[in-house]
């Protein structure tokens, strides 16, 4: 009897036994077609055996056409992911094979890679960066001020790998970034890279997967999930904007795509480039401990000056009611527009206002299913929860005390800033970019095209606009609320605020004219602003690392979170307490249980347990043993978050 254990791309499934027919020759990693629950699926040959304990064994139907297979390197990555992030093999296989490629054959278009490329001349600083990268196999961080030409450096590195016939993966935190990168790529290399994201159709994904497996696809640009594409000849992984939180997946499998990419590079013997003007503290730590190497660019491309940073003390501003732009900022915008230059107004808050409340009884409009305020969206005339998507109408009277004309809104969102800008600058062409206003890559591309062609005078945006866009005529950036996010209790609040302000400021003055950035703040003495103002990220990183070390928090320790959720708060809390009580004794620190910052989400109450351990401690082994000591009832969902980025 010949048995193959087949790994199917089905959540929470382990490899299943199937019988191999006499005429079928199989190797580990081969892709096969099998019957599973009244359907035919593509599976991976995970293991070969001569016997099975299963009572009924189905027979493998066939091998996938063209003898396609998953490399041993990708299989090793699946095993590592399952072990490190404590997730089921089937769930991870679903990332590698997100669709069934065993259906009728599809013609695969081969990328026509030229043997020459039109690449611009690098500066001496950039040439030195390429040389340093080539001389070591360590992951290399290209750290440079915004506009220093980091993309051009990794384009030159990509060219070297394409000349060797290798496959290349370019990872972006948001696929919204891809249009400008794609256009620049086509200009340099003469062919269009493959895009891998959630908007790609099933038919396209099937074609792309087959193209990758057959080595006909050479370059892919994608977000998190592109990391798991089954390359056979992967030579280079570029992780652009490596600091970005979007690389961490916070649903289904909880994993960090940046960190996993480093591991994939080890398995595939692929070289790694990380790029950022504001690297993560983890990456800075890895450089200081000599795990990564550093390339620093101190000059903008063509030696363009960095923008001036001006901090506006909002405690000294006397703003009219429902106004959020200071006189200093308004005057600066007027001058900028008179000079035919573009303006970016940044506020990392969607909608019109973050809170509606009753002045009579104090009632706050919160989500029925979450512990979150409902955000007013004037454009759609709705109150919306940005966590679960619940919407309701805008009330004319208070539903609690029934009083009329007592409802008021607090604080601005970008829709409110748009309204104010339209009143102040009625002749200007104003556009808004956020997840609400640009829901598709095509819409984002349209807005970017309008900005590049000077069809927009004032662009108002959320965090989406901070991610690497290049607008040569944009010379003024106004940050409406520079305090937003810096005063909460999150471990990484200071780091995120510094990165965000530095990144958004970097959109200004990328052409021939010097830029200026205005930060509006009610706490102008915040030390973060002083680092941003002088561009001293090294001192910021040093100070932040000292704070983390004193608190024994990452990157100086390991952390994991257990998130328990369910519809009965008392039952979930009881289970959480029981879990903590039976924790095996070890050299770990256990905090909690405590309500999660988002204590209710989509109708479920949430409690969190945080575990802190030494970097050499086997946290996964400890958690596996710990959780085996208790049976979790079906009404309680438990998630394990290894290396949590947030504690919401």
From Swiss-Prot:
Residue ranges of the motif DEAH box: 240-243
All residue ranges annotated as the Helicase ATP-binding domain in the record: 131-297
The EC number(s) this enzyme carries: 5.6.2.4
Entry binding sites for ATP: 144-151
Annotated GO CC locations: primosome complex
Listed PROSITE patterns: HELICASE_ATP_BIND_1, HELICASE_CTER
Keywords: ATP-binding, DNA replication, DNA-binding, Helicase, Hydrolase, Isomerase, Metal-binding, Nucleotide-binding, Primosome, Zinc
Pfam families in alphabetical order: DEAD (PF00270), Helicase_C (PF00271), PriA_3primeBD (PF17764), PriA_C (PF18074), Zn_ribbon_PriA (PF18319)
UniProt binding sites for Zn(2+) 2: 367, 370, 385, 388
Cofactor: Zn(2+)
InterPro entries: DEAD/DEAH_box_helicase_dom, Helicase_ATP-bd, Helicase_C-like, P-loop_NTPase, PriA, PriA_3primeBD, PriA_3primeBD_sf, PriA_C
Statement: the UniProt record of this protein carries the keyword ATP-binding: yes
Any one GO molecular-function label of the UniProt entry: ATP hydrolysis activity
HAMAP family listed in its UniProt record: PriA (MF_00983)
Assembly with partners or alone: Component of the replication restart primosome.
Family: Belongs to the helicase family. PriA subfamily.
Function: Initiates the restart of stalled replication forks, which reloads the replicative helicase on sites other than the origin of replication. Recognizes and binds to abandoned replication forks and remodels them to uncover a helicase loading site. Promotes assembly of the primosome at these replication forks.
The protein's name: Replication restart protein PriA
Gene responsible for this protein: priA
